[in-house]
């Protein structure tokens, strides 16, 4: 391959930048630079985590052949992590699904049949029959959908509209329930609005970074490279990392803290106490902008009502709170002394004091980052509320370099799962199904009869598993996730429901995942740039991309599947007469007609697409579907602090952070001069709350749902590794990533291994009260658990670690605690 001088310099610049950030550049990234003239390039956000890195996608002869970091992308500035560099290869696994597959026996569907190729017509015929039978016999509560924070914005919007307005079922929930639900409820309780008030620009202006249950070095490596650059360029910048085990982020930490599982609640209250005792409360900010409330306690663990822990709880699932005075709050946190905190957490006193001093120092700009360590927690909402307390006490919020920041793990957990409202209790723009006014807004905008959207909250993720097992949920459509592997307590609740002959399970996926192979019908799905899409990242940045290639075989996008399936239902088959009588003109029409082919959605003509621009869905329907859906959806947030820009602006930008008002994005919300919704003279206004004030909550320590005992004597924490994303359904099909980390291992302290006669490399049986897996002992390497705890990643389909985990959830957010259950080890 011949390189021009310009191409050679560009290739070396990429390599040098990556090396400076501690990132590697694989050969595929270097090789593409010299082929620029032969390759067509276009922009897209990365397919993986919630960071939202921009990439340039190279296509040639109908295939993605190359990928490189987009130097014009403000998030990553031309860099990619190791997964981002291998994006092209996720598309072309040898077992890519290209046609629908139905379990069949003797020529027809059978629950115990073999997967057999069928046409889309046949697949939809079976789905139609199953949906209509369940709707007729049991009603809307008998059908459900489990979606994704990887859906594009219009896919999630179409799914929510089809289920909540079309089928009149709120039994739709995203896999973001497993990762971001606690953050959502935490934001709503404290601020009355979802999502962070800051942005990634804070990194270059902060004086201190505190990571709470977040291994950014591996899970958000591009952001970590920016933090690393900030830390190494200024000796006064400090980094504190808190976790239940040591990991790669500890390598940069000035204060690396390993605490006893669940005791982060104690540390948070101790810091609040320290701030008050050392007169570090920002009195002016606190007096003007904060209210105090005492939350209900002893709220249970989100288990079945028959579980002993739920029976014993005084206030199961209670979100109640009552006003309290500052003196009462001061007395409440005063119980969390330094001595008590050190004893309960196992953290040395000097480390606790150093941490508290970062927050208390009025001259230090502090950012708190967290991910699953906080959120996947039976008191995850409380943990979110308690870290907000620290920033509200000190006024370190909504200003450059200051603020609490919940990081997301999926590319559109914010943009789709949260903003669109694909949760079982939500509607677009932070509205909820239980609020009559909110339902009325949606019904009028969608031009459907009043009362169409049910007022009852639907089944959340774990409740869906239980309802399937109990035979109450009978038709279940899973899209863009691998929950059979990723969800908790596989043996006891999920697998029995999926294989119950009363139930029919559909999985839409590009690959034969554990979930797909456990289903009754598999629908082959288009991936990433095989469709036009939009994601919303962790800093409220909405990013668009165009379809750049066609999907293989008969694979279709989730959007196509939803819209085309809606044609199978007439309004009379899904809506009662009481609704139809309000709008008799809708009789005889299909759900496609009343939801997706409406004047509002279909008004943008195909002429808005360039002649050679791929867009399979729109060209098949005859109008610009994605634009119609987006503009209809964006209406909900405009003028209400969730403003999205006009559709076309996003194709011309590297993303925009909402609220976007008069063409200008917002970096810092709630503060005067930064947020267009805060008027001159107001200083700060937390306008999600009626009085414009945020809330500090008094919430205590409460123990985990399950702790080690004499038989199951070790804590188990689960999570990810750098090389693989979630269940590995994409990354394990990339040979280089698979070789880098080919199978899951059990990270264990050397002394715990020695006490059990285990050595590095030994096979070991890991058992809990719910199941067991066989794994490999690892006493060295990147993760270093303390004695009494083991860590396992969940990417390996041959080691289903979620056979072990407990389906306990935060009672407020319904998010599963994947970080704490009890296990034992035995040599194999």
Swiss-Prot record:
Coiled coil: none annotated. InterPro entries: Asp_de-COase-like_dom_sf, CT_Nitrate-R-NapA-like, MoPterin_dinucl-bd_dom, Mopterin_OxRdtase, Mopterin_OxRdtase_4Fe-4S_dom, MopterinOxRdtase_cofactor_BS, Periplasm_NO3_reductase_lsu, Prok_molybdopt-oxidoreductase. Disulfide bonds: none annotated. Its cofactor is [4Fe-4S] cluster; Mo-bis(molybdopterin guanine dinucleotide). Substrate binds at residue 794. It catalyses: 2 Fe(II)-[cytochrome] + nitrate + 2 H(+) = 2 Fe(III)-[cytochrome] + nitrite + H2O. Pfam families: Molybdop_Fe4S4, Molybdopterin, Molydop_binding. Residues 1-31 form the signal peptide. SMART domains: Molybdop_Fe4S4. GO terms for cellular component: membrane; nitrate reductase complex; periplasmic space. Mo-bis(molybdopterin guanine dinucleotide) binds at residues 83, 150, 175, 179, 212-219, 243-247, 262-264, 372, 376, 482, 508-509, 531, 558, 718-727, 802, 819. Binds 1 [4Fe-4S] cluster. Binds 1 molybdenum-bis(molybdopterin guanine dinucleotide) (Mo-bis-MGD) cofactor per subunit. Residues 39-95 form the 4Fe-4S Mo/W bis-MGD-type domain. It is an enzyme of class 1 (oxidoreductase). The keyword NADP does not apply. Belongs to the prokaryotic molybdopterin-containing oxidoreductase family. NasA/NapA/NarB subfamily. NCBIfam families: NAPA, PRK13532.1, TAT_signal_seq. This is Periplasmic nitrate reductase. It comes from Salmonella dublin (strain CT_02021853).
């Amino acid at each position: 391959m011949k390189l021009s001088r310009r191409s050679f310099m560009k290739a070396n610049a990429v390599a040098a930048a990556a090396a400076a950030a501690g990132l590697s550049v694989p050969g595929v990234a270097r090789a593409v630079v010299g082929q620029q003239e032969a390759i067509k390039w276009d922009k897209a956000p990365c397919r993986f985590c919630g960071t939202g890195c921009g990439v340039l996608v190279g296509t040639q002869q109908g295939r993605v052949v190359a990928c490189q970091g987009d130097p014009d992308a403000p998030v990553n500035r031309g860099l990619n992590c190791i997964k981002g560099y291998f994006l092209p290869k996720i598309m072309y696994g040898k077992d890519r699904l290209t046609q629908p597959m139905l379990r069949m026996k003797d020529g027809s569907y059978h629950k115990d049949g073999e997967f057999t190729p069928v046409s889309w017509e046949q697949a939809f015929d079976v789905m139609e029959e199953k949906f209509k039978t369940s709707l007729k016999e049991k009603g809307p509560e008998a059908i459900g959908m489990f979606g994704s924070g990887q859906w594009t914005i219009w896919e999630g919007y179409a799914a929510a509209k089809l289920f909540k307005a079309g089928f009149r079922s709120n039994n739709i929930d995203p896999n973001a329930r497993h990762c971001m639900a606690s953050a959502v409820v935490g934001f709503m309780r404290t601020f009355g609005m979802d999502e962070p008030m800051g942005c990634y620009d804070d990194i270059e202006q902060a004086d201190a970074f505190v990571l709470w249950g977040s291994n950014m070095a591996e899970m958000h490596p591009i952001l970590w490279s920016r933090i690393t650059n900030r830390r190494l360029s200024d000796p006064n910048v400090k980094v504190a990392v808190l976790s239940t085990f040591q990991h790669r982020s500890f390598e940069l930490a000035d204060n690396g803290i390993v605490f006893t599982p669940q005791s982060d609640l104690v540390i948070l209250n101790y810091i609040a106490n320290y701030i008050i005792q050392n007169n570090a409360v920002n009195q002016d900010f606190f007096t003007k902008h904060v209210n105090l409330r005492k939350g209900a306690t002893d709220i249970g663990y989100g288990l079945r009502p028959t579980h002993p822990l739920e029976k014993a709880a005084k206030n199961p699932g209670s979100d109640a709170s009552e006003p309290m005075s500052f003196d009462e709050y001061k007395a409440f946190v005063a119980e969390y002394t330094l001595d008590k905190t050190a004893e309960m957490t196992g953290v040395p006193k000097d480390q606790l004091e150093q941490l508290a001093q970062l927050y208390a120092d009025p001259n230090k700009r502090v950012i708190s980052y967290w991910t699953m360590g906080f959120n996947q927690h039976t008191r995850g909402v409380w943990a979110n509320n308690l870290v907000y307390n620290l920033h509200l006490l000190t006024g370190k919020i909504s200003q450059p370099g200051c603020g609490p920041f919940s990081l997301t793990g999926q590319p559109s957990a914010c943009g789709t799962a949260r903003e669109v409202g694909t949760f079982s209790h939500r509607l677009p723009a932070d509205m909820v199904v239980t609020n009559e006014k909110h339902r009325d807004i949606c019904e009028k905008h969608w031009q459907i009869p009043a009362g169409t959207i049910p007022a009852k909250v639907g089944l959340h993720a774990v409740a869906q598993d239980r309802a399937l097992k109990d035979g109450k949920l009978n038709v279940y459509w899973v899209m863009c996730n691998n929950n059979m592997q990723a969800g908790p307590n596989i043996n006891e609740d999920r697998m029995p429901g999926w294989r119950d002959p009363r139930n029919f399970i559909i999985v839409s996926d590009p690959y034969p995942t554990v979930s797909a192979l456990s289903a009754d019908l598999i629908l082959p799905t288009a991936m990433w740039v095989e469709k036009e899409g939009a994601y919303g990242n962790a800093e409220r940045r909405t990013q668009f991309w165009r379809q750049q290639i066609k999907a293989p075989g008969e694979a279709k996008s989730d959007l196509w599947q939803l819209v085309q399936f809606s044609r199978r239902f007439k309004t009379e088959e899904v809506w009662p007469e009481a609704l139809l009588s309000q709008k008799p003109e809708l009789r005889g029409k299909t759900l496609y007609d009343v939801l997706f082919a409406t004047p509002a959605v279909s008004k943008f003509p195909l002429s808005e697409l360039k002649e050679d621009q791929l867009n399979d869905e729109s060209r098949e329907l005859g109008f610009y579907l994605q634009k119609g859906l987006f503009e209809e959806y964006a209406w909900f947030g405009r003028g209400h602090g969730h403003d999205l820009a006009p559709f076309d602006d996003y194709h011309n930008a590297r993303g925009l952070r909402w609220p976007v008002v008069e063409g200008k994005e917002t970096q810092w919300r709630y503060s005067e001069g930064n947020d267009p919704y805060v008027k001159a003279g107001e200083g700060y206004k937390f306008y999600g709350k009626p009085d414009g004030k945020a809330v500090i909550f008094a919430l205590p320590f409460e123990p985990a749902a399950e702790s080690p005992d004499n038989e199951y004597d070790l804590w188990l924490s689960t999570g990810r590794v750098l090389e693989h994303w979630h269940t590995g359904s994409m990354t394990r099909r990339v040979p280089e990533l698979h070789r880098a980390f080919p199978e899951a291992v059990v990270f264990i302290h050397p002394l715990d291994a020695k006490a059990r006669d285990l050595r590095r490399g030994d096979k070991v049986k890991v058992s809990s009260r719910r199941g067991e897996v066989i794994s490999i002992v690892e006493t060295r390497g990147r993760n270093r658990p303390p004695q009494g705890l083991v860590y396992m990643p969940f990417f390996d389909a041959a080691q289903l670690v979620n056979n072990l985990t407990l389906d306990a959830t935060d009672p407020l957010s319904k998010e599963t605690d994947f970080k704490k259950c009890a296990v034992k080890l035995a040599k194999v």
